[in-house]
């Protein structure tokens, strides 16, 4: 029996579908449901001098992310307790959230295309967390 289900979303069109899958599990277990989005840390991508205000860009992205998470939660068929966002290493951010919020099931999506088979973030996440995972196939059309 799960007590807290965390669904990792990328804020793409499939995010609502993935959230509804997680909502179904949470509903059946009478569990808490939360969502999380992890942004890449843009400052880590640049090694040279660039005339870009990274702090301003990160703030704007963070605000847009939070608004998207709120909208996603409002459209959920099940109440969403926490709307989390983080930046940095996907596996580490998820592991930290799982520990901090006492999550016992992580729900993620997985694209079944050529590139995802080569470079799946799901594999990395599986190596970093110690709770059950539900990996939902997301088919590209």
Curated annotation (Swiss-Prot):
<comment type="similarity">
    <text>Belongs to the universal stress protein A family.</text>
</comment>
<comment type="function">
    <text>Required for resistance to DNA-damaging agents.</text>
</comment>
<dbReference type="Pfam" id="PF00582">
    <property type="entry name" value="Usp"/>
</dbReference>
<keyword id="KW-0963">Cytoplasm</keyword>
<comment type="subunit">
    <text>Homodimer.</text>
</comment>
<dbReference type="InterPro" id="IPR014729">
    <property type="entry name" value="Rossmann-like_a/b/a_fold"/>
</dbReference>
<dbReference type="GO" id="GO:0005737">
    <property type="term" value="C:cytoplasm"/>
</dbReference>
<protein>
    <recommendedName>
        <fullName>Universal stress protein A homolog</fullName>
    </recommendedName>
</protein>
<dbReference type="InterPro" id="IPR006016">
    <property type="entry name" value="UspA"/>
</dbReference>
<dbReference type="InterPro" id="IPR006015">
    <property type="entry name" value="Universal_stress_UspA"/>
</dbReference>
